[in-house]
Amino acid sequence: MGACPPKAKGPWAQLQKLLISWPVGEQDWEQYRDRVNMLQQERIRDSPLLQAAKENDLRLLKILLLNQSCDFQQRGAVGETALHVAALYDNLEAATLLMEAAPELAKEPALCEPFVGQTALHIAVMNQNLNLVRALLARGASVSARATGAAFRRSPHNLIYYGEHPLSFAACVGSEEIVRLLIEHGADIRAQDSLGNTVLHILILQPNKTFACQMYNLLLSYDEHSDHLQSLELVPNHQGLTPFKLAGVEGNTVMFQHLMQKRKHVQWTCGPLTSTLYDLTEIDSWGEELSFLELVVSSKKREARQILEQTPVKELVSFKWKKYGRPYFCVLASLYILYMICFTTCCIYRPLKLRDDNRTDPRDITILQQKLLQEAYVTHQDNIRLVGELVTVTGAVIILLLEIPDIFRVGASRYFGQTILGGPFHVIIITYASLVLLTMVMRLTNMNGEVVPLSFALVLGWCSVMYFARGFQMLGPFTIMIQKMIFGDLMRFCWLMAVVILGFASAFHITFQTEDPNNLGEFSDYPTALFSTFELFLTIIDGPANYSVDLPFMYCITYAAFAIIATLLMLNLFIAMMGDTHWRVAQERDELWRAQVVATTVMLERKMPRFLWPRSGICGYEYGLGDRWFLRVENHHDQNPLRVLRYVEAFKCSDKEDGQEQLSEKRPSTVESGMLSRASVAFQTPSLSRTTSQSSNSHRGWEILRRNTLGHLNLGLDLGEGDGEEVYHF
């Protein structure tokens, strides 16, 4: 009674799944959830057992339990038992009574979506009901039960993601006592959910960073006493991400800094100077198949790019870029420009000869044609051109050999879709290389029309030069602006432009369909009308007019409407759209530049031979830290905030003494013998006793100075961590 309907088998199972999942779309998820909740409440009201469990009605529960016809296994609308209902409403007494009568209820999960697999222990943990958790564990509740329903999956529909196990639920709600209790009863801290996420992965995804950091430390303290060879922090999920890498992908700077604090080793401190060794495990992209830096720059979340400003990532990237990345990138840019000059020269001096056949069409102006293969390489000039063509073809092959493996490694959608990684430029360069090889095939087979692939290849090849603008801080963000304008503003504008051109070109053609084309031939046929309207739209040409003849009246009306809509409205709209895109990208200028540098550095590091790009950092053996690699960073901390803090403490003390000074002014005998305050010692000021005539003005001045100092202190403390000058060594 109240249980879920039996599941269909075979093709009917897929159909049933489709019909069930149909209403659970992004737009209907809230309605679906509300409908489930309504059915659940109706079912609870219809069942005396469930209603008694909800209202903690112990008298009614005892009567029902004594009734042998009462089914303790009856379930609600989502497959929940009476124990689920009692746990949901924090009714400890009702839950205890139910477990005494039917202990097996402690292990029973919910059977229907969206709460499949949820046990009463999951609910008690989420409610942080410690006593109920103890009671459930005492009666054999499973600490390894998994809640796999749609309500517990990581999805935009759900507001929370706590994993599937009770331990991850307890860690996410921040209950240290329940976490310890579950581990004492055998909960596996290395358990993974259907996504492969451990409890550490799930903590990374929580919005409450404070609880997450505390629970992270607690769980690691238990893992340190385990017998596993691999640390829990190094266990990857199904995407190959460890908790540390997941923090980078999600842009969780708080957790990233917390983990880095656990990994750093302070060498020495001397006044404002501090030398620190930072563990580069999982950070350095050298030899990493799934690079942390590449994951950060390719993340869809803007917060991830803030990781690039954190120590030691900022110092590591800066060192690699200045020492290896920038020199190699400039060399690569120079080689590519020379290569394109060679290709362009070969195209300009391609083998041509006079046309053999006679021209029969008066509109045909062709006088030259391409030579056959046997005639193309005869003279000394042809041999020189052959060398350039071989260089061009070899370069195209090298480009494909470098690009194609990365497509399979990263995936086509991510490789071509990430702007920071240079996605559109990868499409351009691969297309260019393919066109060069196509031209070679056409040349070898004596096929006519090689001018078509050559023309496109020249345009695409020279457009690829813009990729190397990312090596310069002034030009790098502009390439991203161009990409966003082309694939964002321009694409939307082209749809509107196509509609307007089709409409007005048809109107112009119909208007001049009955007129003599010799007098005004811009709209004589439909293709010509389309092209002329396109030129008019972009104001390339002026409106066609012939004042020696009478033009159709409808032409004037149509052209006036076209001029207002196209020129005044749509072109200015397009300019405004591009201006908005420029403003938005300009706000992220520094972030985008840093991300471009990181992506370029990782790309070069992956492509270059190891002897040209040695590993960065210091081996831990030199400091007795094992085989891990470290980056040494020297920080110079500004002590001004500390000095201002002492000033503020002095001012606070002076406030307390103001009242005493007022009393001392009434007693002249004690004016000279008062104790010096901390402020007088700190500032070496005159005696704090002041005459009555000077008291008000002096007190006002001290108050202004004190407030300004407090404001300066708050600003200094907010920015104090970033004021230090950092120097990094290897």
Curated annotation (Swiss-Prot):
Changing F425A: Decreased inhibition by the synthetic drug econazole. Residues 349-385, 443-448 are extracellular. Changing D550A: Minor effects on Ca(2+) permeation. One of its GO terms (cellular component) is apical plasma membrane. ANK repeats lie at residues 44-74, 78-107, 116-145, 162-191, 195-228, 239-268. Activated by WNK3. The keyword Transmembrane helix applies. Homotetramer. Probably forms heterotetramers with TRPV6. Interacts with TRPV6. Interacts with S100A10 and probably with the ANAX2-S100A10 heterotetramer. The interaction with S100A10 is required for the trafficking to the plasma membrane. Interacts with calmodulin. Interacts with BSPRY, which results in its inactivation. One of its GO terms (molecular function) is metal ion binding. This is Transient receptor potential cation channel subfamily V member 5. Keywords: ANK repeat, Calcium, Calcium channel, Calcium transport, Calmodulin-binding, Cell membrane, Glycoprotein, Ion channel, Ion transport, Membrane, Metal-binding, Phosphoprotein, Repeat, Transmembrane, Transmembrane helix, Transport. InterPro entries: Ankyrin_rpt, Ankyrin_rpt-contain_sf, Ion_trans_dom, TRPV, TRPV5, TRPV5/TRPV6. CDD domains: CBD_TRPV5_C, TRPV5-6. Residues 1-327, 409-419, 470-492, 578-730 are cytoplasmic. Ca(2+) binds at D542. The lineage of its organism: Eukaryota, Metazoa, Chordata, Craniata, Vertebrata. The chain crosses the membrane at residues 328-348, 386-408, 420-442, 449-469, 493-513, 557-577. It is found in: Cell membrane; Apical cell membrane. Glycosylated. Detected in kidney cortex, in distal convoluted tubules and cortical collecting ducts (at protein level). Detected in duodenum, jejunum, ileum, kidney and placenta.
